[in-house]
Every structure is written in C-alpha cells, then in structure tokens.
Swiss-Prot record:
GO molecular function, one term: DNA binding
Keyword Repressor: yes
Protein name: Heat-inducible transcription repressor HrcA
Chain ranges passing through the membrane: none
GO BP field: negative regulation of DNA-templated transcription
Phylogenetic lineage: Bacteria, Pseudomonadati, Pseudomonadota, Betaproteobacteria, Rhodocyclales
Coiled-coil regions listed in the entry: none
Family under the similarity heading: Belongs to the HrcA family.
Function statement: Negative regulator of class I heat shock genes (grpE-dnaK-dnaJ and groELS operons). Prevents heat-shock induction of these operons.
InterPro entries (alphabetical): GAF-like_dom_sf, HrcA, HrcA_C, WH-like_DNA-bd_sf, WH_DNA-bd_sf, WHTH_HrcA_DNA-bd, WHTH_transcript_rep_HrcA_IDD
Record-linked Pfam families: HrcA (PF01628), HrcA_DNA-bdg (PF03444)
Amino acid sequence: MLDERARTLLKTLVEHYVADGQPVGSRALSKFSGLDLSPATIRNVMADLEEAGFVASPHTSAGRIPTARGYRLFVDSLLTVQPLEARQMGEMEEALHGRPAGQIIASASQLLSSLTHFAGVVIAPRRQSSRIRQIEFLSLSEKRILLIIVTADGDVQNRIVTTDKVYSPAELVSAANYLTQNFAGLDFEQIRHRLTVEIKQLRDDIKPLMALALDAGDAAMAENTTPYVISGERNLLDVEELSSNMKRLRELFDLFEQRSSLMRLLEISNSAEGVQIFIGGESGIATLDECSVIAAPYTVDGQVVGSVGVIGPTRMAYERVIPIVDITARLLSSALSYKSDN
C-alpha cells in the first residue's frame, strides 16, 4: 500500500507524462506535485515506486514513465474524471439522434474516434435477436424451398433450403402458419428453445422442415449483420509509441481486420456494469500489450445488446476518454431505444 506522498508523486508523474509524452524527472515532480520534498527524497520515493513496478526508467533518460501497473493504480484510485461540458454533450446527442437506424452504429463509432483521436469501435446488436413477424415457405422445385422471414421492424430476409423429401404446398402453408401463429414476436433463439419443448406436438414429417427453417433463419439473419464497426484506425499512426514499432502496428491493424479477438474482449463489458478499462496486458491479447481499451455496454429498451469502445495507447487522457465512452454508450442506448419505439 502506497503512502500519500508516493500516491501524489505517482499521480503527478502520470498526468505530466500523459500530457507531453516525455519521461518525468525529480525536478518536475518537485515543481508540480505541491509537496515540500527535497530532490533526494523524491528520488528515493521514485526508486521505491520503480521497484514496486509502478514506474520504469527508459534507458535514454533519467526521468521515469508509468507502467501498466502504474496506470492501473492511477485509474482505480487517483483519477479525477472530467465531466463533459453541456455543449459537447449536446453535439454528441445531435450526432446520433435523428439519423436512420442503420447509420446510428457507424455514427457512434465515428463519434468516439473524432472525440478521442484514437480508434472507435462499436459492436452492433446481433440481428439474430430480431423478433419475427411472419415466416413463409415457397416451393421452388421438388426439394428446394424459399424461406421468407419478415421481422418486427419490417426487414425481409430470404434463404433457399434443400430438403430430403418433397413437401406439398399445403404442408408448407401449414408449417409456415404454425411458426407464425405460435412464435410471432420471438427471435430465432427463443423459437428454437420453445420447439425443443413442443417438438412432440409436431408431425414427424414437419419436424425436419422446422429444423431446416431455424438453421436457415439464423444464417440469413447473421449474413445481413455487420456486428462490428471501427473508425479512426489511422489515428493510431499519429501515436508515437505505436507508430515507432511498425511490426506491432501491422499486428494491430491485423487484429482490427480479423475482429474475433477484439469482439470477444469488448463483449466482456456486456455482462458488466459501467465502463470497463483494460490496460496493456490486462486484455489478454498480446497485440494490445501497449494499448488500453475503454469499453461500455449499451442497451435497447433496457436489454444489453452491444458495446462501444476506444482503442488507443496506454498513454491516454483517461479522465477525458472514460466519460466520452460512457456518454456515447448512454446516448446510443437512447437513440436506438427511440428507434425501436417508432
């Protein structure tokens, strides 16, 4: 446990290093910390902080810089978050509200990027959870059927399925009516769960068609999904700590393109409350060892459906980025919930 003197010096060091990117020496700490300490005492305290893993000494400088552990202590117990100005919040709200539903996710990603000058990312609501209004089957040939799905928000998805047997038009109408009458208002996951309970009530010849319809419906909805939108990746080219290592920078852009690892990280915030902060190696992704990820969940009608985040260097103004991510998540929730009600 650090004493108050050490905590004050660490806070001062982090703030100054974030501001100008240069290692912080004892003279600057003496000037800006507000502590009446001799240079020798400050050097001793800094040596203790370095031994404890909170700061490090670059080989080319007598000053020190924060480590990931130092940033973590700073964020957890030393940080004073700066509330956003009313004017800026108004501009953020205007950027998201009043747009077509399909543009809101992309706008949120661009908003995060433009405000932080890092990469902004949004995991979109999964379309598989769209509620179903109507399902129809249309025979194309003996064993090829067109599945037509109409969602509650008016989207229409089509999928061709191949069956093992020939279904008559009457059987297709019967199966479609059964699904529509019994499962309208549910998503495919809920329908699948209900059918596992009610499967005994179905005729044996209809059961395979129901299974095909569910699988095809899931696939059709997934294909029309853009689950991940990222903006401002090029901003990271201007971050000296990242751009100085081209190999690591290429790996970072590969991570953005592959998506799956980053999506899994961001989805962790879906099950947590408020803003989640991953500093350096805390992400569990080696490519992000020199980065921080700030993420928060957003909701539609009170249900968590995705997350927003900012990816940047560990040297970032956390007191500013954290509220930007938090407010963006809240405004996105409001904008999407409004769309779902209209």
